[in-house]
Amino acid sequence: MATYLIGDVHGCYDELIALLHKVEFTPGKDTLWLTGDLVARGPGSLDVLRYVKSLGDSVRLVLGNHDLHLLAVFAGISRNKPKDRLTPLLEAPDADELLNWLRRQPLLQIDEEKKLVMAHAGITPQWDLKTAKECARDVEAVLSSDSYPFFLDAMYGDMPNNWSPELRGLGRLRFITNAFTRMRFCFPNGQLDMYSKESPEEAPAPLKPWFAIPGPVAEEYSIAFGHWASLEGKGTPEGIYALDTGCCWGGTLTCLRWEDKHYFVQPSNRHKDLGEAAAS
């Protein structure tokens, strides 16, 4: 029995299946962890959702910002952007079934035995694990309820950007959503910066990657995350695993086998697509 952690798939279905064949993933025996952003940008978002849903208890995933945006498009709140390549999914006969399943997925995965935590963007250093679990449940409860469109309409925005237990209502839910799905840089006190997207070396002072600021969760648990493709899986402290390596941008899809910390990669088909386009 093995545990495989895979970074942001972003609709790259063919690469996902090739990578799972490479590692000899066996549903029912092995467990697959996915860092979120299953959809958008790649050509196979519909196939990705159908496949991941079919895995049942053999998969543990978290929602990413692109997954939430898809739900907002589905609810009629946000615009379907052509670059996201979501139309086949939105027009599929099983779209309702797939997206109602998707909105019931968690923001946080925890394995106490492995001392492993996974969230799409990471864990803000302002939270301990108890707070992170409570915050994840708050958003998950709204997403799985009939009032989820109201939340999705209000989730967009960069404020508030500083955690306080006193946060209430939509501001609290927006901060939680941003921390779990959009976070990259923080100020030294842990306050979120929602504007900078460059590499850590190019970020303006005093910003630091969230994982460079000591926090209580990282002291006791390993943390796996995606979201930040420009890291290229590098530059994180021991016990922090950056798994998004930009498959949808022509990079690779990365898998970490947890038991021996061995990495597997599958090159993006985007190189092939671009080459064929240039030759045609």
From Swiss-Prot:
Xref: InterPro entries: ApaH (IPR004617), Calcineurin-like_PHP_ApaH (IPR004843), Metallo-depent_PP-like (IPR029052)
EC number: 3.6.1.41
UniProt xrefs under Pfam families: Metallophos (PF00149)
Membrane-crossing segments per the record: none
Gene3D superfamilies in UniProt: 3.60.21.10
Domain of life: Bacteria
Catalytic activity, as annotated: P(1),P(4)-bis(5'-adenosyl) tetraphosphate + H2O = 2 ADP + 2 H(+)
GO function term, MF aspect, one: bis(5'-nucleosyl)-tetraphosphatase (symmetrical) activity
Uppermost EC category: hydrolase
The UniProt record lists the keyword Hydrolase: yes
UniProtKB keywords: Hydrolase
NCBIfam families linked: apaH, PRK00166.1
Function as written in the Swiss-Prot or TrEMBL entry: Hydrolyzes diadenosine 5',5'''-P1,P4-tetraphosphate to yield ADP.
Family of this protein: Belongs to the Ap4A hydrolase family.
Name assigned to this protein: Bis(5'-nucleosyl)-tetraphosphatase, symmetrical
Gene responsible for this protein: apaH
